[in-house]
Amino acid sequence: MRYEDLKLNLRKIIEVPGAKAPFSCELSTDELDFPAVVRFDEPLKAEGAVVNTAGILTLKGTVAAKMHCVCDRCGAEFDREKTVELNAGIATDESEEDLFQMEDDEIDLDDILFTSFVFDMDAKMLCKPDCAGLCDGCGANLNFEKCSCKKPVDPRWAVLEQLLDK
């Protein structure tokens, strides 16, 4: 299945407990816009299945991407692979508002896959979990060098520092 056609027909599994409707597709990343992601190196790749478990439809699978990013703390560019585990409920009637809705026994796969991927993105993209960032004073990348800036003194201790300077 290509990203131009991302409807998955579930008619054959709706009334059959234990039935599965597998899928495998690629999604264009042209419409995804994240400030820290410079580019996606390839389309999002998704695979999995919608499973009927005792009349409850659940989409299970993964969606994965390779991205080229900019660190939100230090500005360094880095590559990151991200895989999101999918576990989304599918509504069989319109009364289930907090689930993804079917229309004419079909689900809109790109809506579910993009939504799951976007909601799982990190709020801040970091080159490494312990990134020290840049010095506010001189701009030195604290991951690689120490800065020579004088640390600001807490104003509550300023009087004591004046005594130490004498």
Which stretches of residues belong to each language-model region?
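Structured interface patches
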Residues: 1-166
